[in-house]
From Swiss-Prot:
Species, as recorded: Rhizorhabdus wittichii (strain DSM 6014 / CCUG 31198 / JCM 15750 / NBRC 105917 / EY 4224 / RW1)
Family: Belongs to the TRAFAC class TrmE-Era-EngA-EngB-Septin-like GTPase superfamily. TrmE GTPase family.
Keyword annotations of the record: Cytoplasm, GTP-binding, Hydrolase, Magnesium, Metal-binding, Nucleotide-binding, Potassium, tRNA processing
Reported cofactor(s): K(+)
Highest taxon, organism lineage: Bacteria
Major localization class: cytoplasm
Organismal lineage: Bacteria, Pseudomonadati, Pseudomonadota, Alphaproteobacteria, Sphingomonadales
UniProt-recorded name of the protein: tRNA modification GTPase MnmE
EC number: 3.6.-.-
Amino acid sequence: MPPAPLENSPGASASDTIFALSSGAPPAGVAVVRISGPMAGVAIDRLTGSRPRPAARRASLRALTNPDGGALLDRALLLWLPGPGTATGEDMAELHLHGGRAVTAAVLAALGRLPGLRPATAGEFTRRAFETGRIDLNEAEALADLLAAETEAQRRNAMLLAGGALSRALEDWQHRVLSLAARLEAQLDFSDEEDVAPLDPGFAAELAALDAEVVRWRGRLPVERLRDGVRVVLAGPPNAGKSTLLNALAGREAAIVTPIAGTTRDLIEAPVALGGIPFLLTDTAGLHEGTGDAVEAIGIDRAGQAIAAADIVLWLGDPGCAPAGSVRIGAQADRRTHDSAAHDLLVSARSGTGMDDLVALLLDRAAGLLPGEGEAALSARQRAALDRLGEALALAREEGDPILVAEGLRLARAAIDALTGRAGTEDMLDGLFGRFCIGK
């Protein structure tokens, strides 16, 4: 059966040789063009004329010429990378060009005229790595997160998963589940249908140990807080200094500040990185009773919803009215007198008083909401599949009937396959690899 056409490129096939600019848009000091597929070696032969192909995995300076006429295109560093030990698992080549627009365009155009070559679609190099088994779905997702990472915490988490932290555990679990299933099948095969021997204690102990490891992974924190930021809501009555404090934390004028009460009527969000950790700061409408303004009433209602969904609430108001668990801030400390004993912090966004202490407090609170050193946060997809794996192992452990134990182990294998992407749907894969840029 021929390879299926690719979703984003009508008529294209997964057996084509693909190429793309994989470095930043020119002009630049160097432009890197990647080629992957069965014709990668032929492509560099055509661009370099009759010269012998470079030694594998050694950079070689070569003149690149247009196959149609022989005009010199550039003098470039060329890398020949025969598969399968490459990023995509296929034959690959890299051209390190002078990074001008005209040079890059000329080389890409020359490649496009070679038979069997076509431009890559978004994420196609990574998809080929997945389809050849060089990476699994978790590593592909982590690579997408790494490319999107804007903070140190996001980078660290992506690197843990891209480095195979979860994938290694899954490979081990799959081996152990298969081993247990094989032992069980052998016992069933060599037993009379009406006289199946009970499972031996060693079998149950191995199953329990596996379940305990899965339980630990199921307890990992969600990655969404790392991706979207720790939600910090600034709340309190009108004119309490919420917008001024948000602007100071964000380092920009994200919210309008005036002496007029009720200036902020809707939620104003400002993403910010503090100490390498992502936060999502939210300014809210001033809370008070008896407003006759319908628009302001909607803003107050939304403020209440934001407070309920917050990870951290900074309360700028009467300490006695502070929501449970909130940080009581005595704001505008350069102009107002506060009872320091009733507040957690006294700050002034204008003078900077207490701002370092506030940032330190936010980082301390965030540390309890984010994964610890060496622990990876997991996506909703990963957590759901781990839950299914845990349920399957629970079935296998609770049922004394070997037939039902075998069914639990079968469901466990299916859950592991879903985690690694062996049982992924095309729509889900298309959505993932569409997050990548062309050339990755």
